[in-house]
């Protein structure tokens, strides 16, 4: 009797997992806003979720597929050193790239009919975005705030790269880097 019950429970668990993984992301529970998860180790190989996100952005919005990884020997703390940050190559000096960036941000931060905000960004496990002297962080509900790199005294003395004017930086949670949030699970299942 116990063996039969164990088999039934195992079968039910497998069936539930298959059903959940085949649901579109919209049918899965919406993730909460990501908390800040800074780099704590160094494993710079590009994580599957980071690669998926980068390809999705470039395929849908154009622009260039910039770096994901950064060497462990590079200074400072960076999610690039854990393979969970993507730099989307754009130029803030061109209206075309500013429009591309605005289109992505609008899509990521769109409000659902039921009032839930930032749905796609939350499903993708985005921790924060830095672009064109501004930062949008999940832990501040993606509110647009001025950004100045700690390596710069002023914007005038700061390079385009440190100001994130030649790329959009997108950092992911560890789960998202592993492609283990609802957006990735739904895409992998289809």
Model-flagged regions — what are they?
Residues 1-27:
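Secretory targeting and sorting signals
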Residues 104-190:
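Catalytic cores and adjacent binding grooves of peptidoglycan-active enzymes
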Residues 28-137, 171-172:
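Secreted/periplasmic proteins that engage bacterial cell-wall peptidoglycan
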């Amino acid at each position: 009797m116990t063996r039969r019950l164990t088999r039934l429970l195992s079968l039910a668990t497998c069936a539930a997992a298959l059903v959940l993984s085949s649901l579109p992301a919209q049918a899965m529970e919406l993730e909460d806003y990501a908390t800040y998860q800074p780099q704590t180790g160094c494993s710079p190989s590009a994580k599957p979720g980071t690669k998926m996100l980068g390809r999705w952005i470039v395929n849908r919005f154009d622009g260039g597929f910039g770096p994901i990884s950064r060497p462990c020997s590079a200074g400072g703390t960076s999610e690039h050193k854990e393979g969970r940050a993507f730099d989307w190559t754009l130029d803030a000096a061109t209206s075309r790239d500013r429009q591309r960036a605005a289109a992505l941000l609008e899509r990521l931060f769109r409000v659902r009919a039921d009032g839930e905000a930032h749905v796609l960004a939350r499903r993708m496990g985005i921790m924060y975005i830095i672009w064109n002297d501004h930062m949008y962080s999940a832990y501040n509900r993606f509110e647009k705030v001025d950004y100045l790199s700690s390596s710069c005294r002023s914007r005038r003395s700061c390079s385009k790269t440190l100001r994130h004017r030649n790329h959009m930086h997108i950092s992911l949670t560890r789960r998202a880097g592993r492609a283990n949030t609802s957006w990735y699970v739904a895409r992998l299942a289809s």
